[in-house]
Amino acid sequence: MSNHTHHLKLKTLKRAWKASKYFIVGLSCLYKFNLKSLVQTALTTLAMITLTSLVITAIIYISVGNAKAKPTSKPTIQQTQRPQNHTSPLFTEHNYKSTHTSIQSTTLSQLLNIDTTRGTTYSHPTDETQNRKIKSQSTLPATRQPPINPSGSNPPENHQDHNNSQTLPYVPCSTCEGNLACSSLCQIGLERAPSRAPTITLKKAPKPKTTKKPTKTTIHHRTSPEAKLQPKNNTAAPQQGILSSPEHHTNQSTTQI
């Protein structure tokens, strides 16, 4: 509709321009015939008409420009916003279903991965629990359970002797028949049963310390043959003195008599 009105206005302007041309030609003819008064009046009227027509055309163009600016801006905004805001319900439902199923599949896959690492799945929980119970019952008599205190709290473990100690359960002496190790470890009566299981500590044999004995340094001096003979003479002298001493005593006793 706006384009149709615009074409009509252009046609009217063209017709007015043609009419003004004819009017100017007629005035020029009158001027040639020396009709000045009529020409002056005609020129004044033509000037007034042109001024009014120019004002009217300016107003029309301004109004048409404003009218064009408003509808052209609105459709552009609507065209840009339509695909974002107004979507078909089928498209949205399909997207919602696809996203919902994808989220469920991802969560289930994550849970299955976690359960496979732990050794369990959601498919058969009852069978697995039964199998676990059977396995635990079958393994109970084979495994040794640690003793429990009457107070209900286990004694603190020594982490230092953890590697070198072994805990043994309570063994009555009636079961030991000819076993020396069993008879040495068994307890007689329930009253003597210890609150804590006996521990056998495996002590490591200490390594023998090797001490090096200091070596005596012997110094050999060269001696002359005369020096070697001197101690023999010295040793012989006291023997003579010892042998001559009783004779000397006898001589003294005789002189006294």
Curated annotation (Swiss-Prot):
Pfam families: Glycoprotein_G. One of its GO terms (cellular component) is extracellular region. Residues 70-92, 118-166, 204-257 are annotated as: Disordered. It comes from the Viruses. InterPro entries: G_prot. GO terms for biological process: symbiont entry into host cell; virion attachment to host cell. Residues 73-90, 150-166, 231-243 have a biased composition (Polar residues). Keywords: Disulfide bond, Glycoprotein, Host cell membrane, Host membrane, Host-virus interaction, Membrane, Secreted, Transmembrane, Transmembrane helix, Viral attachment to host cell, Viral immunoevasion, Virion, Virus entry into host cell. Residues 67-257 are extracellular. The chain crosses the membrane at residues 38-66. Residues 204-222 have a biased composition (Basic residues). Residues 1-37 are cytoplasmic. Residues 187-198 are annotated as: Binding to host heparan sulfate. Disulfide bonds join 173-186, 176-182. Glycans are attached at residues 72, 80, 85, 87, 92, 105, 139, 163, 199, 215, 233, 251, 253. Belongs to the pneumoviruses glycoprotein G family. This is Major surface glycoprotein G.
